[in-house]
Amino acid sequence: SAASDVYKRQCLYTAMGGIHLAINNSPDLSTLAARKTIAPAKRRTFLFTELAANIVFESILNIAAFLFIIAVLRIHMTAHLGLALLTILVSTTFSITFGMFLGCIGPRSEGGKTGLMFATVMPMCFLSGLMMGNMRVVVEKHAPIINRINPAALISDSFYTLNNYDSMNRYARDILTLLLMTAILFIVSTLVTRRKTYASL
């Protein structure tokens, strides 16, 4: 349904939280981050704590929106509530980490970073069929590899699989791919942030 597609797109737009996280930990962009460089606590501790707080906060919001859709709007989105909540948690974690990655490598201004996020997320959503229903089928026919690495397609396919398949193999592949991509983006973001910190000293 249109509501469920909007919800899946919203899971990716939580990347905004990751962009703010990156800015707040870049000494060349934020006075707060500059103060952190001389704080006794390790920079890694700040980053982990803020990332965890962002994930918890955004996950609560996304879960609340999900429960509103299924309980109030009465739109069926899954037959496996527990796994659906896991999907939301993994999707939110990926999105925030993705936003942090874009915040680390993107333009210097916050507006530029936000623009980069929209310029990246919207094509992902389009190719996954969240903007035009049959697009994912077209991509699957002509370039299936895109559906295997497109985060929007993986999130959408996770919910689709929970609704339509008894086997969890495809669902597990989607979730594990998202987790792997999250880990890679986090490592790269941490290294870039650390390099910027050293450069600012």
Whereabouts are the PLM-identified features?
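Short, small-residue-biased leader/transition segments that mark boundaries at the very start
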Residues: 2-7
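Short alpha-helical transmembrane interface motifs in multi-pass membrane proteins
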Residues: 12-17, 49-50, 79-87
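Transmembrane helix boundary and interhelical loop/hinge segments in multi-pass membrane proteins
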Residues: 18-39, 43
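Hydrophobic transmembrane alpha-helices and immediately adjacent juxtamembrane helices
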Residues: 38-39, 44, 196-201
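Selective transmembrane-helix segments that form parts of the transport pathway or gating/packing helices
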Residues: 42-69, 84-85, 89, 93, ...
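Membrane-interface helix termini and inter-helical loops of multi-pass transporters
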Residues: 70-78
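Membrane-spanning alpha-helical segments of multipass transporters and channels
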Residues: 79-201
